[in-house]
Design a protein with these regions (language model features):
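Short, Lys/Arg-enriched charge-dense amphipathic segments
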Residues: 2-14, 35-38, 87-92, 114-119
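Short, glycine/charge-rich flexible loops or terminal/linker lids adjacent to PRPP-binding catalytic cores
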Residues: 1-35, 44-50
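Residue-level preference for alpha-helix termini and adjacent loops
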Residues: 18, 24, 28, 41, ...
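A contiguous pocket-lining binding segment that forms or flanks enzyme active sites
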Residues: 28-70
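PRPP-dependent phosphoribosyltransferase catalytic core
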Residues: 53-125
Length: 125
């Protein structure tokens, strides 16, 4: 994305390195720099919101998060709202199971199981 848009790129680790300079963020991040973080998968938003905090600690202005896929969990919506960070994804769980059903990868029983998981993944059995 940065190469195609001719914008700078940083890489945010889940925690600072325990060797070398001990950086959590690689790349040039200037104070006040508008920043959008990109993540592959958003479930609760926890990991990418830690990256947001790391960038904010370096005085970046995080204007949003973009993900490739979201499970659309209520926890993610609440966590992003609490952090006051907007987020969007290219696709999501609802669209995935819709396409899977239309393509005959899943049947009606599978659909019910997938929808039940989506309603309460922590307690699903």
């Amino acid at each position: 994305v940065p190469e195609k848009s001719n914008l700078p790129m940083i890489y945010v680790r889940s925690k600072p390195k325990d060797h070398g300079q001990g950086r959590q963020i690689e790349g040039v991040l200037k104070p006040g720099q508008k920043t959008v973080l990109i993540d592959d998968l958003i479930s609760t938003g926890g990991s990418v919101l830690k990256a947001v905090k790391a960038a904010q600690k370096e005085q970046a202005e995080v204007i949003g998060v973009v993900g490739i896929f979201s499970y659309q969990l209520t926890a993610a919506t609440k966590n992003f709202a609490a952090a006051k960070i907007p987020f969007a994804t290219l696709t999501n769980y609802r669209e995935l199971i819709e396409v899977a059903q239309q393509s005959d990868y899943i049947d009606a029983d599978d659909l019910q199981l997938l929808q039940a998981w989506r309603k309460d993944p922590q307690n699903w059995q």
